[in-house]
Amino acid sequence: MKSKTYTLGAGDLSVVLRDDGGLLLDAVNDAKTGSAFLSESRPLFSLTAERLADDETFTVSSADGWTVDCTETDGSRLFILSGCEKLPGVTVTLIANLGCGRIGFETVLSSVNEEITLTVCDWPNLCFDAGESAFLFQPYGSGEVWSSVARESFSQTENYPSYGASMQYLAFWDESKKRGVYYGLHDPAPASKLIHVSRAEGENTVTLKISQPLEGISKGCNSQRLYGENVWQIFDGDWFDAAMLYREWAIENASWIPETDENGRKDVPQWFKENPHWWLSRMDHDNVGEETVRATKDLGCKSAAHFYNWHKIPYDNDYPHYFPPKDDMAENVAVMRRAGIRVMPYINGRLWDTKDRGNEDWQFSEKGYPNCTKDRHGKPFIETYNSRESDGKKVELSIMCPSTAVWQETVRDLVDRIFNELKMDAIYIDQIGAAKANPCADKNHPHPAGGGRWWIDSYRNLLTHAHLASDNVMITTECTSDPYMKQIGGYLSWLWIRDGQVPAFNAVYNEYVITFGISYGSITDADSDCMRIFFAQSLVYGVQMGWMRPDLYFRMSHKDFYRKLVKFRETYADYFYGGRMLRPPYLSDNAPRLVSDKCTQAIYGHVDYPAVQGGLWQRMTTGRRLLILVNAAEVPADVDMSVSLPDGTYALNGDMDGSVVLKDGKASLTMPPLSMVYMFAD
């Protein structure tokens, strides 16, 4: 049978689909520049199913022998795929909405097959040709830009929301033409998702896709509509412009946007907004309070303490029984408080130890097991870390189901006691923003089996309930997952220590949530080059600095450089909590790049950045802009910059005097070693 093509046009974007025994993505074109982004056809999507009788999982692509029917309506195309021998009784309906300069895809699944359950479905895959000038954005942590050809192959799939996918969008662009395609999942009350980028070895095609783990996985015939709309849109520019498309949608539509004014979050206490620096303080010795005070005095700036191991139970063991606290906890907290240091203790927000009193099952079988996540056969999902029981075996921690009343009350009661008994300033509830949604299938729980919106909704309900424990509840969590920010005031950005980072998350959300700290403990040997990279990035990205142990601070090199950056963060805090990140300046410099292979959270431990980092911020009350440049090299750097500021003469502040002349948005200057320079634009 002769193949048939369908052209979907929206603004400058033209997408060609081909019916050839299934539905293929045949072309992605830019009408404005005449660019053809894709030269080789690829399947448009894939659908994964599981046989209920034997648990065998298999995946079928849109090219695997489907009958395709297309109906054209006003402003949309309707594609119905049916008759696939590998998936009998399953129909996929794909709706392409054309308008407003973009294509918006919706997906509906229909199954009358009782022998299989549908488990994961892609939205349409966006594919493009790899090349020297072709780059992609993926939302790991702060966001990362990858060259499409830097490695022979790559494949990364991350769970949204989690440490590996802070937002639900991807993008690619041609750097030489500054044109690309935004690929966003506009799901305002979001379901959990999988976010994927790949290029197979020996192939020249890069695939961007987002998938949804499906609902109703405990039985067959689990028909459903995927949540949200998959938006494809041409844009001018690079990662920042793609971020602005996601921001525009999220601010107007997303259910997680908190109330703000010209000073940022309205529900976050002022001390937290203004705090420039964090210590990672563990009660693993008697004088942690005095050590934290001594480090704060040496730093010369306000600090807060993220307080671990305050409980008698071991770390990652006997959860969730954090009370009673250690006998000397109160005195250590009092020592820090007398020095003006705010204290934020740690608890975990998702784990219950299966042996929760030493080597004994105390409450797990009675309370933990009925309320933990389980597969469709009733087997609990279990995680292990480095902690061990008294018999030497690894501690087995069950992942609790956030939909259950028992777990919601357990966390709420802990928050109540920490604020009302211990009188703490904030609470850190670990893993909520970092860990994936588990596809719980316990039929006794109040949610559909598998994926969907229930996991995120349940945690947001849990957090809302926890806020009722006290009038001054301030909650933070691990990592920067966007759908929780309405209930969470601060995100520990600890994994923002990888190669290729760009500040996309804060470009989208800076005034809506506080980001704080990175994992300096992940930098082996306290590598100086690596640490200086992230000193500079933390400042220009708008992150509250630190999250290092006081003993590491005393050992590290270049404390004067670090103190200087923290002091600047303290002095101009209002530009960060009450400001917007504008497009960062484009910079080039002649200093040696800062390279390290000692960052354990980076791919292969490797990071490689220019010596000079920069950021541009705008105060919301006045509109005044603040340009920050940091030379993290130990040598002078000749810097050329292009920045979105009016031409004119600007006074230099910080480690340079005089002025710089900006003409056609460009200027040059020579920065001293280990320096920070800033300028204002009214």
Q: What is the role of each PLM region?
A:
Residues 28, 211, 220-227, 455-657, ...:
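Active-site-proximal substrate-binding groove within the catalytic cores of carbohydrate-active enzymes
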Residues 86, 98, 102-104, 113-123, ...:
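Conserved structural scaffold segments of CAZyme catalytic domains across common CAZy folds
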Residues 305-326, 358-402, 435-462:
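Aromatic- and acidic-residue-enriched carbohydrate-binding clefts of CAZyme catalytic domains
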Residues 398-488, 500:
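Active-site neighborhood of glycoside hydrolase catalytic domains
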Residues 3-9, 13, 26-201, 667:
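Polysaccharide-binding surfaces and accessory modules of carbohydrate-active proteins
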Residues 328, 334, 342-422, 498-510:
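Active-site-adjacent "subsite" loops/lids of carbohydrate-active enzymes
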Residues 284-298, 407-420, 531:
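Short, acidic/polar
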Residues 662-682:
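C-terminal beta-strand-rich structural cap/linker in extracellular carbohydrate-active enzymes
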